[in-house]
Amino acid sequence: MTIFQKSFILLIIWNFSLFAFSDMKIEITHGINTAHPIAVIPFINNENITHELNNDNIEDIASIIAADLRNSGKFNTLPIAYLPYQPSKLTDIIPTFWEKLGINTVVLGAINIKNENYVISYQLIDTSNNPALVILDNQYEIEKKHLRYTAHTISDEIFEKLTGIKGVFCTRIAYILYTNNIKYAYELCTSDYDGHNQVSICRSSEPLMSPAWSPDGKKLAYVTFASGHSELIIQTLTNRSIDNIIQFPNHNGAPAWSPDGKKLAFSLSKTGSLNLYIMDLSSNNIQQITSNRYNNTEPSWFPDSQNLAYTSDQGGVPQVYKININNNRDSHRISWLNGSNQKPNISMDGTFMVMVNRNKGKQYISKLNFLTGEEETLTADSVLADTPSISPNGIMFMYSSIILNNSSSELYLDKKFTNIPDNNQSILSLASIDGKFKAHLNGSTGSIRFPTWSSLSCSY
C-alpha cells in the first residue's frame, strides 16, 4: 500500500467525525542548542503557488519539515531569518560557506502544479563534501489536502536517513480535552503528533479518561462515566461502533492493549480491592492477574505481550512492579527512585520505561533504563508532569503538565489561554527522551490530559 493510499484511507476514517477543532501550535521552551544543526531552505515554487502560500491557502512544506526535525530533539533547524542566502539548486551550494556556519546538511525542495495536483520534490544534501552531494531525494504528486502529510513523510525519510531511526512524524496521538462547555465538558480527541488536524471522537457531560490505541491504530479503548459509573469502551474509529463494554461493579479503568493486539489489560475493583485483569479479545474471556488487598492498576505491556509493568501500593506507597501474565507469583518491584513511582509506560523495544515520580511535594516524569539500571528525572522544571507516553521510535515522549496562571508561579506565566478550569491549564508537552529538548503544544481552549501516542502502523 502506498503512502497516498494510506492517506486516503485515514482521511475517510477521520471524516466520520462531526466535530473538528483549531490546531495547536508548538512552543519551544529549551534544548535546541544541543542538537545537530541543519538548514531547511524554503521550497521554491511558481507564481500561482506563491500567491496561495501568501494567502495561507496551502501548507508551508519547509516550515513543517523544519519543525518536525526540531521537535525530535535531534536537530537544530536554522531559522529562515538567519539564512544568509537561500540556494534553490545543488549547484548554488558553496560547502565552505555552510561549513563556517557549522552546518553540513541542507534540505532543498520545490512545489509545482501538475493538472490539479501538486508535485513536491526535495533533496537532502551533504555539504561536508566539496562539491556537495545529494544523499537522498524523492518526489510526490499529490492532492492539495495531502500536503501536510507529505511534509511529515519527507521529515520521516530525512530523519531515518540521518539517524538510522524510523521517524514518527506521520503518527497520531489521542487525549482528553476538558472545556467549560456546559453540555459536553469532556471530549476524546485525536490529532497529528504535533497537534494539527484535531478531531473529536466522543463528547460527554461526564468524565472521559485513559485512552489507549490498538496496535493497528483502528480502535481506541477508554474509560467513560456516561452511565454514572466507570465503564471501559472499545470503539472502532472508522464507523464509531462500540465493540466491547466492560462494566463490572465499582471501578473499571486503565486499559492497555498488548503489542500483539490480542489482549487488553485493565484494572477492576469488582471484588473490593483494585486488581489487574486481561481480556482475550477474540473470546472475551477475562483472566485475573493480581489477587490481593492492595491497589494494582495502570498496566503497561512489555514487547513480548507476556509481561506487564504496573503500579501497586503493596509496599506502602505506589511503586512500579513487573509481572508475568502466565505466572502471577512472579511479581517484583522495578522502580527505586525516592518517593513514589507510578503510571509506567514501556518503550516499544522494551529497553526502558518512563513513569511519574512524586517526591518532596514535586511530581516529575522519570526514566528507568532496563539495560543499565539507571534512573533519571526528565522534567525537573515541569509542574505536575503526568501520564507520559513514549513515541513509537523511543526518541520522544509526550505528557501533560500544568500552567500556573498566577504571578506566584515559579516557572512561567502564560496568559494566552481562556476558559481555564480551576484557574490552571493542563497542556500537552513534548520532550526528547534524554530530557534536553522540551516544547508545549499551545492553542487549545481547554485542559488536555491523558495523552497517548499511536504506533508506527497508525498513520494517515
From Swiss-Prot:
It comes from the Bacteria. Keywords: Cell cycle, Cell division, Periplasm, Signal. The keyword RNA-binding does not apply. It is found in: Periplasm. One of its GO terms (biological process) is cell division. Part of the Tol-Pal system, which plays a role in outer membrane invagination during cell division and is important for maintaining outer membrane integrity. TolB occupies a key intermediary position in the Tol-Pal system because it communicates directly with both membrane-embedded components, Pal in the outer membrane and TolA in the inner membrane. Belongs to the TolB family. HAMAP family: TolB. This is Tol-Pal system protein TolB. It comes from Blochmanniella floridana. The gene is tolB.
